[in-house]
């Protein structure tokens, strides 16, 4: 899969306002009421990621979850990253 152009990245990000470009990846931070709620969300993300065959970097700090997406094989952001980000947003 080909890397997206800067213009395409900007366009895709406009439909995902909670996601931010932190080159070379996009990231989203979500806060929950507690650790259990954060872990429940992470487990749902894991299911989506497995179905997509594309896996985010996930950092869990008590009730705070940071997700980061980049397509390592392509050396940057691709449609796969934005498709999975949209899938993750649907969980919230």
Swiss-Prot record:
The main enzyme category here is lyase
Q: Which GO terms describe its biological process?
A: tetrahydrobiopterin biosynthetic process
Q: Key word Ribonucleoprotein present in the record?
A: no
List the signal peptide residues: none
Which EC number(s) does the record attach to this protein? 4.2.1.96
List the SUPFAM superfamilies hit by this protein, alphabetically: PCD-like
Q: Which InterPro entries match?
A: PCD_sf, Pterin_deHydtase
Q: Name one Pfam family in it.
A: Pterin_4a
Q: List the disulfide bonds.
A: none
Determine the domain of life of the protein's source. Bacteria
A GO MF annotation of the entry reads: 4-alpha-hydroxytetrahydrobiopterin dehydratase activity
| Family annotation (NCBIfam families) | PRK00823.1-2
Stated family? Belongs to the pterin-4-alpha-carbinolamine dehydratase family.
Protein name stated in the entry = Putative pterin-4-alpha-carbinolamine dehydratase
The record lists the organism as Acidobacterium capsulatum (strain ATCC 51196 / DSM 11244 / BCRC 80197 / JCM 7670 / NBRC 15755 / NCIMB 13165 / 161)
């Amino acid at each position: 899969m080909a890397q997206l152009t800067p213009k395409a990245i900007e366009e895709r990000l406009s439909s995902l306002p909670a996601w931010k470009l932190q080159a070379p990846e996009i990231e989203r931070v979500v806060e929950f009421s507690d650790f259990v709620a954060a872990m429940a969300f992470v487990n749902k993300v894991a299911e989506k990621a497995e179905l997509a065959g594309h896996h985010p970097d996930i950092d869990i700090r008590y009730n705070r979850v940071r997700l980061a997406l980049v397509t390592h094989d392509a050396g940057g952001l691709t449609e796969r990253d934005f498709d999975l980000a949209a899938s993750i947003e649907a969980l919230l």
